[in-house]
Structures are given as structure tokens and as C-alpha cells.
């Protein structure tokens, strides 16, 4: 039911939080005339809007249709646009047109609007309208399909969803130079003003792929040979053909197509085929859809493949192909066979994950991931955590219905390309299958849009029924079959993650445990490679779920902002009770859950400390930071990963154990990984933490207030500590080399020699401002 006029007026008053002149006419409702003393409009700036050159917003009498307008100031930089926005719930469903008056002194070429709607704040961006110099009215049709979203892979052709639940309204200016444009009289209209400027028409291509609708029983099935020479531990893609046609090729009850692979030693692998649609780089369907199978041979020699249809029962001619040995291949990631607290490849090499969350892209997906992966790989990174969320790579949402992924083939193809980018750069993907918001009504809630919700045509009255309802479970098993068939063959799939932070949903551990057991059995049926499984909570170590044999390793998430050394050490001990000897990772880390303060912490101290604290407190890799797209990448913080990678290169951590260290001052903390003849040491000043930064900042502000002076530009410099002594115990007596490393400068220092006596090594640090690491190795 639509709101009445006075309800709309109240919403707008809340939006602007200032007196608003609202004029109800037959054809218009004025949203903002900018006649008040203040405005809630703001410039979109980095890190949240890293692609925006917006500078400031100011009320002005210049170029106003009434007494005042608002000036939107920007610069012309390498960023292509300037974003200005207001955030507050608005109902924009009352009229079909959004109009405003704009004066352009000649500093802007185009303008577009963007609306974030619904509980997930889905960003809808319009086509842009060309601007002339001088005064003009600009109009946007709110009901048309000239918008693009992440759901449409940023291709125009979708309408705005949930106009009545608009959370953010933004103007996107395309500058031609430094300056400003002047905005006034923002309004909803039922008819477009004569002579108004409107967006340029965009071409919305008609897909060339024809959806499968009719049915025909299969009488033939065939399999094509590999298009490229097959190599051990390299995934193959084989084409399949059948004359069978079904209404839904994603439903194996309608057409169950599998391929039986037989290895040189007689091992049999039954792999499900999947329905595939190729796309062009412009994300348009490329040719007709069809069947494929993906498989990674683990043995060299002669293999046999044969396609099989279950109903009707048909088999193809057997195909024989040769697989060449691949001595350089490391294989799949496993739990380390010699030390279950770490990971290893099939060939025995240690896998030490260094990376971060790169969960999704809200821009040009492939360009973003190529840039992120290039920068991560160039700095020694080798892991990324990616979500199959509704706005990114999910196969099933309210635009698909349940069990038919036809409308999400673009997302599947994009995820193919992301895997390819990762494989080319030595990056391994933790693939998160379910995000909490999809089944939450409180934290990042998306339940109202979930296709399993009875309100949207599903079968579930409550989110927690997803893990108990038999129909929902069977539909999810169908999705798992498709996911396993399409991506399970990749050796660069590090792990399947069932849920992200499930504690934000109403699903309890008692409900979850049998579901994980059932779904793990299902997924391993479809992918025989032995991939690892994990799961996550918003904290970490307290749940008995970690004891389940179906979960390969445990995860800690932390946004407390506390010192990672103490937080990680405490959580690690907690995992001893719940996870046994399983590996542990810090799967998410941030200073806060709401964002990072770049201006307060330009050195990214929390990112740095998290990366180093995790392995030195026993975790199997560096902590995986969150804010990748609005903090790490726009501020070029990638080199922090290189320091960790350089220091731990070629280290066999399976022979070392996290060990207490004695430090001569309370102003520093030291942690070590130690064996009998080898130790790795990290010493950090306690002044090099975000807590110390915040405390120093607060003191500086108080001092300025007390002195009644203006608080100007401020930058934190950690205090310098002098003559610190560190003692390691438990080493065998003898001569040792000590090689120092600066994690912040990413450089090696001098090598020195010490003598270990009575099992104790004493190291002296003349001065310490941030942190130092060292390798202590016995001289042969």
C-alpha cells in the first residue's frame, strides 16, 4: 500500500532534518528547495567513494531558483566522476519522474542519478544526461529500465527495485574541469517538464541465447575430446552434446548427465555435467548454451571418459585421452600431514595463506578483480575470500526463482573468469557459499527478498527453516551439485565455506550441525578432490561445531579494534578446546565493523599488526583483512602483504611452535615461533597500535581545547624505545646467527652472531619505534 501525501511529507522532513518547503501540486512534490540553514547533502569521498572527485557541498545564493541553491564542488582528476549524496529513507514511488534544476557554468559534461534501495541498499545507476552550459531542468524516469546494478553485471536494462524503500539518493557529475554545479528544486513529478534534459538512450541488447522451454526425450549423448593437451593437476573442460531437451537444465530430475572418468590405475570418478552459457567481455551471451564437464586428472597416463544419461539410460562412445606428467604442479590444498595445524599441497609443500577478503565487486567486476589480484600477487599474496552473495556471484535469488539459474549465468561466467585470474596469479580462493544477510532479519537483512521466503513465493516462514525444511534442503543440494560441477575441479579452490557469520541468523548450532553433516556428504559426492571445508561466526572459538569431522579448519573473525596479539592468542587457546588440532585462520579482521579511519591511521597499523600477529600466535596464515575496496586498494596498502611474504618465504612452520618470550620492558611485546635449533621472532612496540594512536589523538584534542587553540593537522609518531632485551628459552646450546628484518620498511638488516647458553638466547635491540622481526638459526 502506498503512503499518502502527509506520510511522504514526514519522510522527507526526516530525510532533511531541517525545515522543508514542500509544495503539493497536481504534477509535482518538491523534495528539497534548499531554503533551510543547513543541508544533509554531502560529497562522496574516498575511501568509501574512491572513484569520486567530489570536494564539498555548500548552500549559496548563486544561481538559485528561490533564495538559495546548493553548490556541488568537484575537481577534474583521473577519477571519472564526482558523487554527491544524501542518505535517509525516502519513498520515491509516489511519482514517475525525478526532476531538478541545475546551473552548469561549463564545468560538467553529464549527470546521472543513483538510488540505493531495499534492505540491502542495492545500487541502481541511471544512464547519464548530457548537460549544456547555463540553466536547465534535468529529468529522470524512475519507472524505466535504463538502470544498471551489480545484479545486471552493470549492464543497462533493469528498472529500480523497491523505489518505496530508497535509502540513498546520489547525483553523479562527469566533470570537464575544476569547479561546481548548482542544484535546486529537487522534486517528483507526474509528467516531465517541457524542454527538460533527459538521459541518453542506451541500447539494451536482446540476448542471443534462446532459453530452453520445450522438452524432448534424449536419444543420443556424446563427449568431445579435450580442446588442449591434458596435464596432471590442470582442470579440463570437455563439451557434451545430447538431443534431449528439458524445461530446466539445472534440475537433474529432468536430465541427469554425468561423465565417468577412469584413471590409468583404475580409479573411477563420476562427475556431474553442468549447463553453460558463454559471454562476451561486454557481458552479452556468446553463442548458444550447452553442456560441459570439468575434471582435474590427478594421475599421468591414459584416461578414459564416457558420458552417461540416467533417464533414459544412455552412454556415449568411450573417449581415451592422454595426460602428461606435471612435475611443477603442487596439487590441491590439504591439511598438512605432518602438522595438522597447517596446510600443505599434495606434493608436500607448505601452503601459508597470505591475503584478504576480496568478497565482491560493485564496479567493473573483471577489471576490479584483475587489478586486485595483480596487486595482491605482486606483493606475495596467495589467498582471497570470495562470497557467493546475492549482489555478486550467487546462482539463486529473487531474479531467478528456486532451482533455475538461467538468469544468473552471467554471474557464473564472471566467477569462472575470477577463478581463471586467480589460477594465473597463484591465488587460492576460499569460496563462501552462504552469507548471513540472506537469512537474517536484523544484521544486513535480506530475508525479505530471499526466494525461499514464503512472502516471495518460497516455502519458508522463518529463516531458520532453511536448514530443517526438506524441500529447501533438496533445492540447496541441487545448487551444490551445480557449484561442485562448475568450480570444484579447480586446484585453486582453497576451501568451501558453508556460512559467513551464521550467528547473525536465527539458525542455532543444534540446527546447523546435522545440516553441515548432510550437505558436506552431498558436496563431496559431486566433487572427489577432497577440498577443505570451513565455516564462520562473527567471533570464533566458542562453538562446539568446530569439533565436527566435516569441518577441516576453524576461523576467527574480529572487529574489536583490540591488540591482535592478545586477541588472537586468547582465541587460539579457545580453539584448543573446540577445534582440537585443526588449523585456524583469522578469516576477517577490521579495526571496526563500520569502516577504517584512514586519516587517523594512514600507516594501516591494525592491518599490519593483524598480518604479523596471526602466524606468531599459531594461526596457519596471516589475518585476512576486510575493507579491500574502500581502504586497502584505494590507499595502496598492498605492500604490507609483501613484508609478511618475504619474511616467511621458505620457512617450514610445521617444525615450530608458538612460544612465550620475555621482554625487558612493558612498552613492547614479543612473540616467537620456535623449534630446538630455529626460532622466528617478532617484537613490536606497544606504541605501535591503533589504541595508542587513538589515545594520543584524544590527548592532542584535549590539549588544544584546554589551550583554546585551533586543532590543526596532526600525525601520530610512535615513541622510540631504547635498549630492549629479549630472551628466548628452549633452544639447544651453541652458536646462532640472528638476521633482523624491518616489517614496515620491508628490508633486511645486519646479521649478527650470538651464543645460546643453558637453552637461553639473549637478543638486544638498541632502539625500537614500530616493530622488528628476526630469524634465529643455529650455525651448522
Place the predicted regions along the sequence by residue.
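Extracellular beta-strand elements of beta-rich domains used
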Residues: 34, 140, 169, 184-188, ...
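Aromatic- and carboxylate-lined catalytic core of secreted/periplasmic carbohydrate-active enzymes
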Residues: 229, 246-247, 591-595, 607-752, ...
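Extracellular carbohydrate-recognition regions
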Residues: 25-50
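Extended acidic/polar, glycine-enriched regions
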Residues: 274-338
Amino acid at each position: 500500500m502506498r503512503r499518502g501525501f502527509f506520510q511522504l511529507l514526514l519522510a522527507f522532513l526526516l530525510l532533511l532534518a531541517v525545515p522543508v518547503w514542500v509544495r503539493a501540486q497536481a504534477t509535482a512534490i518538491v523534495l528539497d528547495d534548499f531554503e533551510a540553514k543547513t543541508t544533509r547533502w554531502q560529497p562522496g569521498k574516498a575511501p568509501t567513494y574512491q572513484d569520486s572527485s567530489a570536494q564539498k557541498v555548500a548552500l549559496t545564493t548563486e544561481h538559485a531558483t528561490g533564495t538559495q541553491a546548493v553548490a556541488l564542488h568537484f575537481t577534474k582528476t583521473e577519477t571519472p566522476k564526482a558523487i554527491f549524496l544524501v542518505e535517509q529513507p525516502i519513498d520515491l514511488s509516489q511519482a514517475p519522474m525525478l526532476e531538478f534544476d541545475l546551473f552548469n557554468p561549463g564545468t560538467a559534461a553529464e549527470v546521472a542519478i543513483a538510488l540505493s534501495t531495499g534492505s540491502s541498499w542495492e545500487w541502481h545507476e541511471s544512464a547519464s544526461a548530457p548537460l549544456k552550459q547555463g540553466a536547465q531542468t534535468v529529468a529522470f524516469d524512475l519507472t524505466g529500465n535504463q538502470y544498471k546494478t551489480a545484479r545486471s553485471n552493470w549492464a543497462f536494462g533493469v528498472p529500480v527495485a523497491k523505489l518505496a524503500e530508497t535509502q540513498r539518493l546520489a547525483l553523479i557529475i562527469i566533470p570537464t574541469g575544476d569547479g561546481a554545479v548548482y542544484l535546486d528544486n529537487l522534486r517528483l513529478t507526474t509528467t516531465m517538464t517541457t524542454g527538460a534534459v533527459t538521459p541518453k538512450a542506451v541500447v539494451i541488447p536482446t540476448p542471443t541465447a534462446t532459453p530452453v522451454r520445450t522438452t524432448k526425450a534424449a536419444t543420443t549423448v556424446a563427449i568431445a575430446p579435450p580442446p588442449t593437451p591434458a596435464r596432471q593437476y590442470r582442470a579440463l573442460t570437455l563439451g557434451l552434446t545430447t538431443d534431449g531437451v528439458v524445461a530446466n537444465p539445472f534440475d537433474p530430475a529432468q536430465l541427469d548427465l554425468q561423465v565417468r572418468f577412469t584413471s590409468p590405475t583404475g580409479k573411477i570418478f563420476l562427475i556431474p555435467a553442468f549447463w553453460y552459457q558463454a559471454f562476451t567481455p561486454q557481458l552479452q551471451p556468446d553463442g548458444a548454451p550447452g553442456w560441459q564437464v570439468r575434471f582435474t586428472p590427478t594421475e599421468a597416463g591414459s584416461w578414459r571418459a564416457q558420458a552417461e544419461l540416467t533417464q533414459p539410460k544412455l552412454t556415449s562412445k568411450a573417449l581415451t585421452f592422454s595426460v602428461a606428467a606435471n612435475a611443477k604442479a603442487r596439487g590441491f590444498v590439504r591439511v598438512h600431514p605432518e602438522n595438522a595445524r597447517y596446510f600443505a599441497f599434495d606434493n608436500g609443500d607448505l601452503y601459508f595463506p597470505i591475503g584478504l577478503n576480496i568478497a565482491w565487486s560493485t564496479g567493473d567486476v573483471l577489471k576490479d578483480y584483475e587489478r586486485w589480484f595483480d596487486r595482491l600477487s605482486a606483493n606475495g599474496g596467495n589467498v582471497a575470500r570470495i562470497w557467493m552473495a546475492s549482489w555478486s556471484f550467487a546462482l539463486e535469488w529473487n531474479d531467478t526463482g528456486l532451482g533455475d539459474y538461467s538468469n544468473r549465468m552471467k554471474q557464473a561466467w564472471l566467477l569462472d573468469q575470477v577463478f581463471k585470474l586467480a589460477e594465473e596469479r597463484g591465488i587460492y580462493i576460499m569460496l563462501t557459499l552462504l552469507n548471513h544477510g540472506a537469512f537474517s532479519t536484523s544484521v544486513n537483512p535480506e530475508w525479505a527478498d530471499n526466494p525461499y521466503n514464503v512472502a516471495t513465493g518460497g516455502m519458508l516462514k522463518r529463516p531458520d527453516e532453511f536448514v530443517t525444511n526438506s524441500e529447501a534442503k533438496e533445492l540447496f543440494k541441487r545448487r551444490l551439485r551445480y557449484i561442485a560441477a562448475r568450480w570444484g575441479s579447480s586446484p585453486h579452490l582453497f576451501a568451501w565455506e558453508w556460512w559467513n557469520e551464521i550467528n547473525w541468523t536465527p539458525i542455532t548450532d543444534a540446527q546447523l550441525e546435522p545440516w553441515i553433516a548432510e550437505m558436506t556428504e552431498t558436496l563431496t559426492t559431486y566433487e572427489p578432490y577432497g577440498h577443505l571445508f570451513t565455516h564462520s561466526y562473527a567471533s570464533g572459538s566458542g562453538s562446539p561445531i568446530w569439533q565436527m569431522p566435516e569441518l577441516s579448519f576453524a576461523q576467527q573473525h574480529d572487529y574489536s579494534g583490540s591488540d591482535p596479539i592478545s586477541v588472537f592468542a586468547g582465541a587460539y587457546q579457545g580453539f584448543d578446546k573446540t577445534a582440537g588440532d585443526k588449523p585456524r585462520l583469522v578469516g576477517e579482521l577490521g579495526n571496526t565493523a563500520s569502516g577504517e579511519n584512514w586519516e587517523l591511521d594512514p600507516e594501516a597499523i591494525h592491518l599490519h599488526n593483524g598480518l604479523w600477529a596471526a602466524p606468531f600466535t599459531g594461526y596457519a596464515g596471516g589475518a585476512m583483512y576486510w575493507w579491500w575496496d574502500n581502504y586497502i586498494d584505494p590507499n595502496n596498502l598492498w605492500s604490507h602483504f609483501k613484508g609478511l611474504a618475504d619474511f616467511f618465504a621458505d620457512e617450514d612452520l610445521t617444525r615450530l611452535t608458538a612460544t612465550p618470550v620475555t621482554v625487558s620492558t612493558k612498552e613492547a611485546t614479543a612473540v616467537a615461533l620456535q623449534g630446538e635449533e630455529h626460532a622466528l621472532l617478532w617484537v613490536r612496540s606497544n606504541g605501535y597500535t591503533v589504541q595508542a594512536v587513538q589515545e594520543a589523538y584524544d590527548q592532542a584534542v584535549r590539549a588544544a581545547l584546554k589551550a583554546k587553540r585551533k586543532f590543526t593537522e596532526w600525525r601520530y609518531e610512535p615513541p622510540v624505545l631504547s635498549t630492549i632485551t629479549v630472551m628466548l628459552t628452549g633452544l639447544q646450546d651453541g652458536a646462532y646467527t640472528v638476521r633482523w628484518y624491518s616489517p614496515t620498511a620491508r628490508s633486511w638488516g645486519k646479521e649478527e652472531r650470538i651464543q645460546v647458553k643453558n637453552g637461553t638466547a639473549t637478543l638486544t635491540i638498541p632502539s625500537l619505534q614500530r616493530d622488528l622481526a628476526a630469524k634465529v638459526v643455529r650455525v651448522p
